[in-house]
Structures are given as structure tokens and as C-alpha cells.
UniProtKB/Swiss-Prot annotation:
GO terms for biological process: DNA replication, synthesis of primer. SUPFAM superfamilies: DNA primase core. It comes from Methanocaldococcus jannaschii (strain ATCC 43067 / DSM 2661 / JAL-1 / JCM 10045 / NBRC 100440). The gene is dnaG. Keywords: DNA replication, DNA-directed RNA polymerase, Magnesium, Metal-binding, Nucleotidyltransferase, Primosome, Transcription, Transferase. Belongs to the archaeal DnaG primase family. Binds two Mg(2+) per subunit. It is an enzyme of class 2 (transferase). InterPro entries: DnaG_primase (IPR050219), Primase_DnaG_arc (IPR020607), TOPRIM_DnaG/twinkle (IPR034154), TOPRIM_dom (IPR006171). This is DNA primase DnaG. Mg(2+) 2 binds at D219, D221. Forms a ternary complex with MCM helicase and DNA. The keyword Transferase applies. Its cofactor is Mg(2+).
Amino acid sequence: MIIMDLGTTKYIIYAELIADGYVEKHDVIGAIFGQTEGLLGDELDLRELQKTGRVGRIDVELTNINGKSIAKITVPSSLDRIETSILAATLETIDRVGPCVATVKVIDIEDIRKKKREYIVERAKEILKQLMSNIDVNTIIEEVKESVRMGEIIEYGPERLPAGPAVDSSDDIIVVEGRADVLNLLRCGIKNVIAVEGTSVPKTIIELSKKKIVTVFTDGDRGGELILKELLQVCDVDFVARAPPGKEVEELSKKEIMKCLRSKIPAEHILAQILKDKQKIDEKVCKDEIRNMGIQTIPEIKPEISITSNDDVEVSSVECNPSNNEELPPKYNKYRKFYEKLIELEDSKVLIINGDKEEIVSIEELINNTDNYKSIDAIIINGTVTQKLIDILYEKTNLIFCKDAKIIKKPVNLTLITFGDLNA
């Protein structure tokens, strides 16, 4: 391996010498200096050029094979392009080395500056890429935003629950399990979030659920399922979102969080499924006890339950009337005329009755203006009553007439009568 100092070298001449006989390295070097001396004058004399540093050390790699000698000659040059070419051509005039006939052929002239330029270009690209990655404007913006969002976490209520700054101002809130979940949602720009912080549901969460639309967002594990069930028992939950199985909310990416929240389902469906599962467990326990007692059971006729395409349980209609399909008490007869008046109108209309006053509004108007009514004698709804509507209206009235009712739970003080019973 030839090692050269290329500090001032511009070109390297590569030549090959073949001698018909056995020669040694010093013979080749002597031939190079001896046979080129005086050919081009003092300006291009190899000895003079070496003294002035314009030509570097001449290296020779010699191999002797089958009575012949093959030498690879390397000449570093700091001359210009023309002078280097002349010097290379001069080497080809060598015809003898010692007593042997020889020929020299220039193989290549390498431009060192070209290689350096190529190296500079490639290295500059690498450095630029590194600089661009280190000074990524988007990354800086995200880091600044994240630091601001991290600082937005507040302590809410007497229990000092971790929450986002928009819990009070937003009409709906997202309830999560812990502080880390709140921080992760804040990083994603979601500010109407509050944490339960423990297994016991704080009173602050219960009170918020009465005034706001609540989405519960829990981990995809057993613990998340237990917290969800407790929240469903004590809070007015509207929607439920779950992290993917085995994952926690705090470790989800922004894309995963948004996907989970978009896939939220009404709490009524979860409650219906819980009731269905509980019924199955109770039936199994009962059967096991009877079997252990040795009593023969009569096969059970199971009611049909309609399952929708997305595995949501369709809650069957619940007719909540005081008469249990018996004739209605006379006190309700006065509402028949209102029913006949309402069915002539379009669906989703509501008739509000307060003494002698009657008012026809849409369901949406009724929901939005509930606070305008202190109490209502009766409400007749030309449509289906849902659990959400019951939860909103039961504090304003204790009598509702409707086409149909699909609910999970009915307040004790509320009488709910369908048009079928009213018109019987």
C-alpha cells in the first residue's frame, strides 16, 4: 500500500513499466531520473522539481514473475494540467532499465482536486441534512406548543382534580382516569378534560355530569372497565370511549386518541349490555343452584334481542304507563284532545301544557329552552322518547305522553304514557 502526502498535490500519475528481465526497485528509480534528465530543460527536470516540492516522492511497487519485472509507478504532481501531462509523456520515453529492455505506459492521471470536490459536495450534503433536522421549524413549534399545553393543566374543584382549562367554558367534557391521561390529551389540543384520580368518583365529577355532556374515556384494561361501571352508576354519562385493548390513554398517540373519541358510543348501549350480561349471570347462578338441589327445570323460552350490524344492543321499547295495559284513570282523559291535535302535525313536535296555556315547539327548542320553564303540567311528544330526553325533562314535569319510549331507567316520580294507551 502506497502512502503519500497529498497536501499540495494536484494530480497523481499512474504508470506501468514492464522489463524483459530481472531488475530491482532502485534500478527502476534510477532509470526514471537518468533517462528523463535533460529532456525538457531545468524547468521540468525531475530532480529540480522534487527539490522545489512541485513533484512528490516517486513510489515503485515491483513484482518479478517468470523472468520478467512489472513495476507500478506513482508520481504525485503539483504542476498544472499541461505540465503534468508533459511529465507523464516523458515517462513513456524510458526504454531500458539496467541491462533489460523496458516499456512504460501511462495508465491514468488522477485529479486529486476533483476527488476533493466530490468529497466536499457529499460531506456538505450530510452536514446540511444534519442542520435541517436539528433546526426543524415544525419540531420547534410543536415543542413550544407542548410546553404551553403542559402549563395549562389546572386543579379543579375542592378535590383539586387535574383538568384542562376549558372544563368550565365547554358544554361537554371528557372524563379520564388520571393526571397522565389529562396531560396526554392536552398535548393533542383537547382542553375540556378532567381526571377522576382514584377509584372513588369525586362529587365534582357527579355535579358536572348533571350540567354537561359527558364522555368517559378509559384504559383498555380491566381497571378501566371497573372505573367505567362505577361512573355509569353515579354519574349521568352520555358517551363512552375506550382505549384499544391492553393500552392506556396516557400512551396513545394523537391519531389513536382522535380515532377512539370519534368511535365513542352512547352510554345507553353500554348500560343495556351490562344489564344483559348481569341477567345471564343471574340466570346461570339460579340454574346451578336448582341443579344442585336436584330439581328438574322447565326449558326457558328466551326473548329475542335484536343486535345491530355494529354489535350495539338495540334497546327494546319500554312502555311505562301506570295502568299496565289496563284502562287509564279518568284524570288523563282530558289529554286525549291534545293528542288528536298533535298527531296532525309533523313528527318531532312537542306540545307543552301549563294550565290553560298551550305551546307547540320542536324537540330541539324544548331541550335548548328547558331553563325557561319552572314546571310543566304535561308534555306530549309526537316522537320517540330517549333516555337523554328523560334525563333532561324529569325535573320539569312528572307527566309525559309519547309515541314510543326507548329508555333504560325511569325516574320514580315520572309517569310515561304512550299514544297507544292514551287512544285505547
